[in-house]
Amino acid sequence: MIYKVFYQETKDSSPRREQTKTLYLDIDAQTELDGRIQARQLVEEKIAYNIELIELLSDKHLEYEKETGAFQLTEF
């Protein structure tokens, strides 16, 4: 399952939409909720990002992300 993680690079200031960045993770999980939990744990263990949202990408959404060139799988 591919998850899109929306985050701010710092926890020191208030989140601003204009500064939101994304990363994509491939998580092996039984359910969507388990995948979100694993994604959050993985990111928080590696980097001190302020995570705003984690969403599971549907097949169509993933294809769109690949077509726009925004998709790049992140590995820790």
Curated annotation (Swiss-Prot):
Q: Which family does it belong to?
A: Belongs to the RNA polymerase subunit epsilon family.
Keyword Transcription annotated: yes
**What do the Gene Ontology cellular component annotations say?**
DNA-directed RNA polymerase complex
The record's top EC class is transferase
Q: Which InterPro entries match?
A: RpoY
Q: Which GO terms describe its molecular function?
A: DNA binding; DNA-directed RNA polymerase activity
What are the alphabetically sorted keywords of the record? DNA-directed RNA polymerase, Nucleotidyltransferase, Transcription, Transferase
Gene Ontology process terms (BP):
DNA-templated transcription
Query: What is the annotated role of this protein in its UniProt record?
Result: A non-essential component of RNA polymerase (RNAP).
Give its E.C. classification number. 2.7.7.6
Encoding gene, per UniProt annotation: rpoY
Mind telling me what this protein is named?
DNA-directed RNA polymerase subunit epsilon
Reactions performed catalytically: RNA(n) + a ribonucleoside 5'-triphosphate = RNA(n+1) + diphosphate
Subunit organization: RNAP is composed of a core of 2 alpha, a beta and a beta' subunit. The core is associated with a delta subunit, and at least one of epsilon or omega. When a sigma factor is associated with the core the holoenzyme is formed, which can initiate transcription.
